[in-house]
């Protein structure tokens, strides 16, 4: 199994734990990778299953939509969306697909470039910096649910649609000839993926 760190941290422990309760002899090999790298691993059959956070080009009959999360502007103090170009942002490294999504939203919404005050290596560190008042962040809603004291505003495109990130399970059909991968896929499909979130 391969997954981005946010999914590995917030969803996989409970998901894999429940599956192992049903099939105690199951062993897992879990790799942390950005969604684009998960796609490469799944394409080369380097993994049985991949969890990805983007709408990559993958066969419809070899993927399952698990959940959809909104992307929000988040800060430790109250703010309005129109304040963002004048506020300091905590930015983070992410895969190119998501970066393009965020940049596209920003440029359709504001004329000025964002003021980057701090750059960190990942989403979790960005969240902690925001929590401690170092600036605002643009974060997926699943990261901020455990911090109700933070102020958040969902990002919306000019056409009124919310900025979202979908979570997919991807696989290759030929691996379903093996019993355990087939059972695991059925388990994930039959489950409420959001129930595996860490703070639920």
Language-model region placement:
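Short loop->beta-strand "edge-of-pocket" segments that line small-molecule binding or catalytic clefts
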Residues: 1-2, 71, 79-100, 192
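Central regulatory/effector-binding core of bacterial HTH transcription factors
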Residues: 1-58
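A late-sequence structural motif
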Residues: 11, 154-199
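A local structural motif
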Residues: 22-30, 108-117
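Acidic, Gly/Pro-rich loop/turn segments at junctions of secondary structure
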Residues: 33-87, 143
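Hydrophobic hinge/microswitch elements
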Residues: 34-38, 43, 111-156
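Short beta-strand->loop
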Residues: 62-67, 71-72, 141, 149-166
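Secondary-structure junction motif
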Residues: 88-111, 177-178, 185, 195-198
């Amino acid at each position: 199994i391969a997954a981005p760190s946010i999914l590995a941290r917030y969803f996989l422990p409970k998901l894999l734990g429940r599956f192992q309760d049903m099939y105690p002899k199951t062993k897992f090999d879990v790799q942390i990778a950005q969604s684009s790298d998960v796609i490469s691993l799944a394409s080369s059959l380097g993994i049985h299953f991949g969890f990805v956070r983007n709408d990559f080009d993958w066969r419809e009959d070899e993927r399952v939509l698990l959940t959809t999360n909104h992307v929000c502007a988040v800060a430790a103090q109250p703010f309005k969306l129109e304040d963002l170009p004048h506020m300091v942002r905590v930015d983070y490294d992410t895969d190119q697909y998501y970066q393009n999504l965020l940049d596209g939203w920003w440029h359709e919404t504001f004329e000025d470039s964002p003021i980057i005050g701090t750059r960190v290596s990942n989403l979790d560190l960005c969240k902690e910096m925001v929590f401690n008042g170092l600036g605002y962040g643009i974060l997926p809603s699943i990261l901020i649910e455990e911090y109700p004291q933070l102020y958040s505003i969902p990002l919306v495109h000019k056409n009124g649609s919310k900025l979202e990130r979908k979570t997919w399970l991807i696989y290759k059909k030929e691996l379903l000839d093996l019993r355990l991968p087939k059972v695991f896929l059925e388990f994930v499909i039959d489950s409420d993926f959001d129930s595996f979130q860490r703070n639920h």
